[in-house]
Amino acid sequence: MNATKFLVLLVIGVLCAIVTARQVKDLSTETKLGASLPKTTTKGIGAQLSATGSTFSSSSVVSYANGFNNPKGPGANAFESGSTFTSGQVTAKGRKARVSSASASTATGEAAAAVTRKAAAARAKGKVASASRVKGSSEKKKKDRKGKKD
């Protein structure tokens, strides 16, 4: 490559760089972030007041008992299984937002089987209980004596 070609390519590169480098306009913070704050907000804090909560509770129990008498003799079997599941979610925004969530569940079961030489007996019972509670509150800004907001 000779010096003339190099100089021409260098000038073209500089011109392209100048053309593509435009002055960036000053944008508002709202435009840059892609979000807009309502005019009613005070410094953007405490504008949205909300308190939400959810909770879920589930219980299950399986009790099984079997007694039988066949030609080979009496027999019995029993099975018991219980399971519980609880979950909760809490979201609080704004000034003095409070949320409490609680859930509880229990599962109990009983299974029994008895066998004698001439007879078989079986018994099964199960009990489940679930409870859930959610409380939430949020306070708005109060006006002071002069009529100004906090």
Swiss-Prot record:
Keywords per UniProt: Signal
Disulfide pattern: none
Bias kind Low complexity: ranges: 119-135
Annotated spans, Disordered: 119-150
Coiled coil regions, renumbered to chain: none
GO biological process: mucilage biosynthetic process; seed coat development
Biological source species: Arabidopsis thaliana (Mouse-ear cress)
Residues of the signal peptide: 1-21
Family of the protein in this entry: Belongs to the UPF0540 family.
Protein's recorded name: UPF0540 protein At1g62080
GO cellular component labels: apoplast
